[in-house]
């Protein structure tokens, strides 16, 4: 059953009716991208794969406190350094967090192959026989393509309606795995064809859900004030997966109004540092926003564009900004920021950007 949002006024109803015209973010029937969150590792049951001493690990294991909106390290905002680390699979597979992720996703790959080729009987026997026919090799965990081989969106699990922001999302560099305090959006879907079955490993069966640009349009919309306003009507202490999946987002793709406007600004906010040099090149050499003032202005522009993408008029936009919950000592959500957001909304109405 869908969650009915907590509404307090007729204006709330009018705003939400406009926002609900868009499809749920997890709806795969819509063209382009979609978002499927999941917990990659668990702090309790997978603790044997974590170490606390960075010198004993090869890569960080991120949790919710290691990211903020458009931030994957403390360069611009005070976030914690990683608490845990782990080792590569070829160093010690029995201690590797990446190996544990691979083990967990093996069944998903097997099931996808079984259904894609109209399997009957035992999944194990059918898939192994299918692959033996095509490549003389049964399915193995090494056929799993890890999500951490690609840049991907993550968002904090712990969230409250009375926090400064309810949704806190970032794109993180590749090579990092995450605990359940940081939900991840799958960057790949499994869509095999017969030609793929000759490959070892089976990486060609994986296709990216997001293009480079749509990854950042999705990030921009997730971190926008309109989406936050929607989510805080149904959040208590955590971002429950099904509540996130049913929430509506404009599914902007290349050629849509506001697509270029939003992805460019989200990318400039997020793609800083050496870890994002490759992504900056893939996006055509974008310049990351480096100063606090510049980042605030770009985020206000992004918020303004998101109001338009949702189809919210000026009165509705003003209502959301006036009604948005403010904490006592905000990082960014100040009266001045809300005024700047409305100013940017008006500038866009006049064709200024």
Residues covered by each model-derived region:
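S-adenosyl-L-methionine
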Residues: 1-353
């Amino acid at each position: 059953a869908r969650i009915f949002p907590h509404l307090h006024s007729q204006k709330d109803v009018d705003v939400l009716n406009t926002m609900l015209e868009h499809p749920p973010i997890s709806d795969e029937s819509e063209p382009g991208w979609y978002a499927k969150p999941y917990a990659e590792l668990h702090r309790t049951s997978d603790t044997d794969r974590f170490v606390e001493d960075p010198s004993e690990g090869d890569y960080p294991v991120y949790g919710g406190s290691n990211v903020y909106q458009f931030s994957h390290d403390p360069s611009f905002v005070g976030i914690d350094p990683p608490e845990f680390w782990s080792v590569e699979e070829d160093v010690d597979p029995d201690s590797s967090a990446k190996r544990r992720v691979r083990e967990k996703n093996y069944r998903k790959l097997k099931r996808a192959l079984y259904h894609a080729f109209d399997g009957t009987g035992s999944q194990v026997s059918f898939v192994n026989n299918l692959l033996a026919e095509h490549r003389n090799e049964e399915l193995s965990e090494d056929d799993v393509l890890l999500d951490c081989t690609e840049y991907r969106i993550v968002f904090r699990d712990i969230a409250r309606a009375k926090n400064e922001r309810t949704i806190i999302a970032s794109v993180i560099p590749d090579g990092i795995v995450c605990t359940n305090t940081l939900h991840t959006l799958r960057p790949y879907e499994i869509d095999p064809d017969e030609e793929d079955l000759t490959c070892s490993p089976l990486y060609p069966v994986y296709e990216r859900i997001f293009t480079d640009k749509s990854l950042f349009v999705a990030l921009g919309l997730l971190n926008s004030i309109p989406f936050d306003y929607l989510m805080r009507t149904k959040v208590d202490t955590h971002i429950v997966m099904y509540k996130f999946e049913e929430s509506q987002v404009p599914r902007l793709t290349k050629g849509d109004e506001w697509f270029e406007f939003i992805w460019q600004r989200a990318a400039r906010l997020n793609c800083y540092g050496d870890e994002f040099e490759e992504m900056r090149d893939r996006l055509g050499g974008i310049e990351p926003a480096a100063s606090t003032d510049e980042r605030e202005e770009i985020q206000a522009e992004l918020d303004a564009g998101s109001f338009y993408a949702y189809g919210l008029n000026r009165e509705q936009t003003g209502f959301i900004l006036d009604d948005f919950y403010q904490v006592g000592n905000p990082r960014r959500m100040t009266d001045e920021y809300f005024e700047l957001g409305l100013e940017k909304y008006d500038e866009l109405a006049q064709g200024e950007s």
